[in-house]
């Protein structure tokens, strides 16, 4: 058994900065980063064609950050996680939570099965500013309308934590027995050439997401209150796909904008509206 080796299971957290599961796994010792394409349990929730193009490009960028040590697999994660843990004698798995109902149901089964095999699981929140179960009305029931949910619930709760630094160094465990797929074997890219329009139109990956945020905060947030209603204007953040795939964390975005208020920005209405819409968008991610 490799006690100081853990599996870091990548999902919608395609980044190194502000990544709680990655940071925790690195602190434990050497890691095996793995991405599993799950078209088995997703049913009607399978990733669409455009999303697959984005995912392919983002995984390519992430693999570079992981020094080409990222393991690729496709199939049922419940089976694949057990297989790699048994083949490589791993007893700890770290991941960041995803909150779609079908994913929650699948992950509960995975946790139960791994516990029977005496494999530890450690999950973290990297996708939401507040955990859903932490924001409740005074009578401990869920909010049903967004405005009171955000104004009374979220803004009166503990402020989202500040983003975490990426690991200064990562030790990788050399996988000896589990065979990784090549990224192209995930078959994420369609055969049709329309995929090239997405690739040419967007800068994809963590570095691109950070650049996009910085540009938005520096030059485009001013005037957001009015400009957000016109997609052709510069005031649209274009952060949505980066947030969806976890190339940048909501905490990073939140505090980058909040820090402007502390610097005395003139247009606080712009920042307030943007932050409320970040809260709304993350409910639907």
Predicted features and spans:
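Glycine/tryptophan-enriched, flexible segments
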Residues: 141-282
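Trp/Phe/Arg-rich N-terminal binding region typifying the photolyase-homology
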Residues: 1-161
């Amino acid at each position: 058994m490799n006690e100081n080796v853990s599996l870091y299971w990548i999902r919608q957290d395609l980044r190194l900065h502000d990544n709680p599961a990655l940071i925790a796994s690195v602190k434990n010792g050497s890691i095996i980063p793995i991405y599993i394409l799950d078209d088995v349990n997703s049913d009607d929730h399978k990733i669409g064609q455009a999303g697959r193009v984005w995912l392919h490009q983002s995984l390519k960028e992430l693999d570079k950050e992981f020094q080409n040590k990222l393991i690729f697999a496709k199939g049922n994660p419940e089976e694949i996680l057990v297989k790699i843990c048994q083949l490589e004698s791993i007893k700890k798995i770290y991941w960041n939570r995803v909150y779609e109902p079908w994913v929650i149901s699948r992950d509960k089964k995975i946790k139960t099965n791994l516990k029977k095999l005496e494999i530890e699981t450690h999950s973290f929140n990297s996708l939401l500013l507040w955990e859903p179960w932490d924001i409740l009305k005074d009578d401990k029931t869920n909010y049903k309308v967004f405005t009171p949910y955000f104004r009374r619930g979220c803004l009166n709760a503990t402020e989202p934590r500040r983003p975490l630094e990426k690991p200064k160094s990562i030790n990788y465990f050399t996988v000896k027995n589990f065979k990784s797929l090549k990224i192209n074997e995930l078959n994420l890219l369609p055969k049709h050439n329309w995929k090239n329009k997405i690739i040419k139109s967007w800068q994809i990956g963590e570095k691109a997401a950070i650049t996009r945020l910085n540009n938005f905060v520096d030059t485009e947030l001013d005037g957001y209150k009015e400009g957000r209603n016109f997609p052709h204007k510069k005031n649209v953040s274009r952060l949505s796909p980066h947030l969806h795939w976890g190339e940048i964390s909501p905490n990073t975005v939140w505090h980058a904008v909040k820090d402007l208020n502390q610097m005395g920005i003139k247009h606080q209405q712009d920042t307030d509206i943007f932050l409320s819409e970040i809260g709304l968008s993350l409910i639907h991610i």
